[in-house]
């Protein structure tokens, strides 16, 4: 009997080929993982590098230099007056009340000067440790707020953005009460970030931050931020039970603490109390008998460009990427900026360091979408930072050689004109720090 040929020989051969192919590939398929199922490669993280960077930015600047800032001699005189037995609640300079520095700063500066001078540091450097402490508190508070609101990486980015702002350099390295303001703002921001997880800690931080603000730039700034906190539930993002409990606790902490200073000042120096009440109760806005306002918005906007760069640029990038009113931290940052800008616009005092009020929310906004920054924009900011601070470093080294060794001659001539009484004096510790960090910085900006 003749064998009947297959009706579909091409299909049979194709099925056989598919079977052979399946048998050979199936072992490989067992090890295949779709791209969306693969675990992302964990980047190597070195948190200690951030601490080292903050140390390099913050610590060396307080050592081995005289009172450079024009306000530093008065602050130092207030600290000396307190050490010699002056009124703890009323800083004084040459026997006159001095309201431009917080009593809290005077207390802490006096403590460090007594504890560290002269065996560990000179009197100026020891007093500046108060600035180091309050600046560190502010950076920690802002960084932890970024971590709670946005995530761990963004918390570090908040700190990096802050220390990258030129406006923080003076308040973070010189004698003065602005570091207390920065610490208080950092505490407030951190308190807001904890309202959903740690109510008691959030209330303590907010209350203490408001009280510290009332002792620094006056009661008006503290009252403005307290009213801002009360208005946040107008947004549905903040209509949560835990936030209401936090507000009650924060006011229970803040109001008694804020009443301590006027009560103590009245009972220790009634005349100084009435001067404070009538002329300094609201800080730059005056007091109960001298409240005054002006239109200063153009001045502050002009100085904001250099004071808060790159924070404001990164904040604008974030605002263009997401709808801020749909995020809890976005509503907070926008409300904070609105209150601060309103106060700055109406302030009768044109003092550029008041722009410090804007740095925490701008840094928080800037860190939110920092990872999504386009390559071209990121490269520009990187180039701008390298060129700006690189040229500044070159100028400082040239100035050092000109003032101490007479080279370059033209620059040495100008240095002698502006500082005719300068005597060449090279301190070992600053030289060690400068010679250590300069090659490290050059290596960091040239590595691939």
Task: Report each predicted region and the residues it spans.
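Start-transfer (signal-anchor) and selected internal transmembrane alpha helices
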Residues: 17-59, 245-253
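Transmembrane signal-anchor helices characteristic of membrane glycosylation enzymes that use polyprenol
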Residues: 42-72, 235-236, 252-266
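Transmembrane-helix signature of polytopic, membrane-embedded enzymes
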Residues: 43-50, 142-164, 182
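Extracytosolic helix-loop segments that constitute the early lumenal/periplasmic catalytic or substrate-binding loops
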Residues: 57, 74-100, 104, 111-114
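Transmembrane-lumen/periplasm boundary regions of multi-pass, lipid-linked membrane glycan transferases
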Residues: 75-81, 208-209, 215-329, 333-352, ...
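Short acidic/glycine- and proline-prone juxtamembrane loop motifs at membrane-interface regions
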Residues: 124, 167-181, 217-218
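Transmembrane-helix motifs of polytopic, lipid-linked glycan transferases
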Residues: 125, 129-149, 187
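Membrane-interface transmembrane helices that cradle and orient dolichyl/undecaprenyl
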Residues: 147-153, 185-205, 210-213, 322-323, ...
């Amino acid at each position: 009997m003749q064998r009947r040929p297959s009706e579909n020989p091409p299909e049979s051969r194709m099925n056989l080929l598919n079977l052979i192919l399946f048998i050979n590939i199936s072992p490989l398929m067992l090890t295949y993982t779709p791209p969306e199922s693969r675990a992302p490669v964990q980047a190597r993280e070195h948190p200690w590098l951030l601490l080292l960077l903050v140390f390099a930015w913050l610590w060396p600047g307080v050592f081995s230099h005289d009172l450079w800032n024009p306000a530093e001699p008065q602050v130092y005189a207030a600290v000396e007056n307190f050490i010699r037995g002056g009124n703890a609640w009323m800083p004084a300079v040459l026997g006159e009340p001095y309201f431009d520095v917080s009593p809290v700063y005077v207390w802490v500066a006096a403590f460090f000067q007594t504890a560290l001078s002269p065996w560990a540091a000179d009197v100026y450097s020891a007093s500046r440790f108060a600035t180091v402490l309050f600046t560190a508190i502010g950076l920690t508070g802002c960084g932890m707020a970024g971590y709670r609101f946005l995530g761990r990486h963004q918390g570090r980015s908040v700190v990096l953005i802050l220390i990258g702002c030129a406006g923080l350099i003076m308040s973070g390295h010189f004698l003065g009460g602005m570091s207390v303001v920065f610490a208080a703002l950092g505490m407030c921001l951190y308190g807001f970030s904890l309202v959903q997880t740690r109510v008691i800690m959030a209330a303590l931080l907010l209350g203490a931050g408001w009280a510290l603000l009332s002792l620094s730039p006056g009661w008006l700034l503290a009252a403005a931020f307290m009213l801002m906190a009360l208005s946040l539930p107008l947004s549905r993002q903040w209509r949560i039970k835990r936030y209401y409990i936090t507000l009650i606790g924060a006011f229970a902490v803040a109001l008694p603490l804020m009443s301590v200073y006027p009560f103590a000042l009245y009972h220790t120096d009634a005349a100084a109390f009435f001067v404070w009440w009538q002329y300094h109760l609201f800080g730059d806005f005056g007091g109960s008998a001298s409240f005054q306002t002006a239109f200063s918005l153009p001045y502050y906007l002009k100085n904001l460009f250099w004071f808060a760069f790159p924070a404001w640029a990164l904040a604008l990038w974030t605002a263009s990427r997401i709808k801020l009113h749909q995020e809890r931290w976005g509503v907070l940052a926008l409300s904070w900026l609105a209150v601060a800008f309103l106060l700055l616009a109406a302030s009768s005092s044109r003092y550029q360091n008041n722009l410090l009020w804007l740095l925490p929310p701008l840094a928080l906004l800037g860190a939110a979408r920092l990872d999504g920054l386009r390559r071209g924009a990121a490269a520009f900011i990187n180039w701008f930072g390298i060129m700006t601070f690189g040229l500044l470093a070159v100028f400082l080294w040239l100035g050092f050689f000109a003032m101490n060794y007479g080279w370059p001659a033209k620059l040495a001539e100008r240095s002698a004109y502006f500082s005719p009484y300068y005597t060449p004096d090279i301190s070992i510790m600053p030289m060690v720090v400068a010679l250590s960090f300069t090659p490290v910085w050059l290596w960091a900006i040239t590595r691939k």
